[in-house]
Amino acid sequence: MNSKIKRIIDFSTAFGPSGMEDEVSKLAMEDVKDICEVHDDTMRNTYMRFKQDKEHETTILLDAHADEVGFIVQAIKPNGTIRFLPLGGWDPKNIVSGEVWILNDKGEKISGIVASQPVHFLSEEKRNGKVDFDDLVIDVGATSAHVNMMKHIRFS
């Protein structure tokens, strides 16, 4: 695979919702380590300075955020489905049936699907109304809250 395409894929698929940008930051630092002096600080700012002739140094500021919109686990229901809240601007109707990843407390990614109540179970009002996050859950294939705890999925 073309290295430029691979780089785009790696950065596009890196896990980085707000507050959890470490994977993106590490990827960026690794990507430029041969051409830049790199360090970060306690506020998760990353600094990259081209390795070059200090006498002819030009300073350029590239200001960008590393985080992406995401979700945070709110609760694990007794049936094993997961209630969640948005991090950033989401339209709930656009994520139904979408694949998501949950980062557990061991740093493992658990695959899930955003699910809603089947249309034939909805009231007339809900069927024709807008979708809210309260109407959605994440299904990771667990049959109970205990199973999700065994997967080390926790809520905030």
Regions found by a protein language model. Give the residues of each.
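N-terminal hydrophobic/helix-forming segments and targeting peptides
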Residues: 1-156
